[in-house]
A protein has these predicted regions:
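Acidic, turn/loop-rich segments in luminal/extracellular domains of secretory-pathway
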Residues: 1-17, 29-35, 39-51, 61-135, ...
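Short beta-strand segments of immunoglobulin-like
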Residues: 24-28, 140-143
């Protein structure tokens, strides 16, 4: 053995640790385009200074239409997302929910720290609050015997409502061409 003691110094090179994210739920509105925000995609990384650089869509939307802007590093406008497309920011993703649907919409994503994607994919759920849809109607014909009073009822009017709400009132927009139309309890009276 040597007469003196020596110090052996070992240096370690840092390696990138993959980032993580978390499942999240955001609120949207029926029949309304929803653009996501950066805050909708949680990002955590033990490597100091790392930040989210990409979001990759791994499983497509369960319903509706998910679109990507400037996907895969390009400069194109809004296009349909396909599996494994990535965007640089949460604001580069938007969802058009299915018409008249309040169903939750889910898709899966991974986050990237500039070097690697997260090891796991996470689910983003968009809930939708209902909005009242206007009812629809159509022209209708009521047959009657000449010189006989007609009393109209709700069933005489073609009516449809996507929420299933029963007819509440009728608004006359054009007056009769012949005869006398009388209203009972008009204007809420």
């Amino acid at each position: 053995y040597s007469a003196s003691a020596y110090v052996l110094t070992t240096t370690h090179s840092a390696v990138n640790d993959a980032p993580t994210s978390a499942a999240a739920t955001v609120a949207g509105t029926e029949d309304t385009l929803h653009t996501y925000a950066a805050s909708n995609f949680a990002f955590s990384d033990v490597d100091s200074g790392d930040s989210i650089s990409r979001i990759k869509v791994t499983v497509l939307e369960s319903t509706g239409d998910l679109e990507c802007q400037n996907k895969n590093g390009g400069s194109a406008g809004w296009e349909d997302c396909v599996a494994d497309d990535y965007v640089e920011a949460g604001t580069d993703l938007r969802l058009t929910p299915a018409s008249n649907s309040v169903a939750d919409v889910t898709f899966s994503f991974m986050v990237h720290d500039g070097t690697a994607y997260s090891a796991a994919a996470y689910v983003l759920t968009t809930t939708h609050s209902a909005v009242n849809d206007l009812p629809t109607s159509a022209a209708a014909t009521v047959s009657n015997v000449e010189d006989t009073l007609i009393t109209y009822a709700a069933g005489n009017f073609a009516y449809s409502d996507t929420e299933g709400v029963a007819i509440d009132q009728i608004k006359i927009t054009v007056l009769e061409s012949t005869g006398d139309l009388e209203c009972q309890n008009k204007n809420g009276g």
